[in-house]
C-alpha cells in the first residue's frame, strides 16, 4: 500500500511539472526602465508613457508578472525647493510629473528620481 501511495504522489508530481505546475512566475527578460519613454507633451513638464514597441514589456504585463512600471520622480527648483510625485505607467495609463516650469517664483533646475521598477 505504501508503494502504491508513493507511486501516485510521484506520478502527480511529474504530471504537474509537465503541465507547467509549480512556480511558473519568472522574472521578466527586460528591465522596467526599458518599458517607459519620456513624453514632453504630458503635463507642463512632461511625464512617461508605455513603450508599446517593446514586445518583452508587453509580454511581462500580458502574462501577469507585473501590472506596470512604478515611477518616483523629483523636480528640483532654485532655492532648494522640490516637488515629488509617484505613479504607475502601464499600457493605456501615463504618469504625469507634478510641478511646473516654476515653483513659488523659482525656476526648475533639474528632474530625477529612483530607478523604475516592476509593480506587481
Curated annotation (Swiss-Prot):
Induction note: Transcriptionally induced by CfaD and Rns.
Cysteines paired by S-S bonds: none
Phosphoprotein listed as a keyword: no
Signal sequence annotation: 1-19
Major place of residence: periplasm
Heme as UniProt keyword: no
Organism: Escherichia coli
Keyword annotations of the record: Periplasm, Signal
InterPro entries: CellEnv_BiogenAssoc_sf
Location(s), subcellular: Periplasm
Recorded superkingdom: Bacteria
The name this protein goes by in its record: Protein CexE
GO cellular component, one term: periplasmic space
Amino acid at each position: 500500500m505504501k508503494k502504491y501511495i508513493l507511486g501516485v504522489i510521484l506520478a502527480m508530481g511529474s504530471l504537474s511539472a509537465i503541465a507547467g505546475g509549480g512556480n511558473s512566475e519568472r522574472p521578466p527578460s527586460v528591465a522596467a526602465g526599458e518599458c517607459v519613454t519620456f513624453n514632453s507633451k504630458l503635463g507642463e513638464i512632461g511625464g512617461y508613457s508605455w513603450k508599446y514597441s517593446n514586445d518583452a514589456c508587453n509580454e511581462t504585463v500580458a502574462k501577469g508578472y507585473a501590472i506596470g512600471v512604478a515611477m518616483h520622480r523629483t523636480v528640483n527648483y532654485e532655492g532648494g525647493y522640490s516637488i515629488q510625485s509617484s505613479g504607475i505607467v502601464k499600457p493605456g495609463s501615463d504618469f504625469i510629473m507634478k510641478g511646473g516650469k516654476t515653483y513659488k517664483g523659482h525656476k526648475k533646475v533639474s528632474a530625477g528620481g529612483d530607478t523604475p521598477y516592476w509593480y506587481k
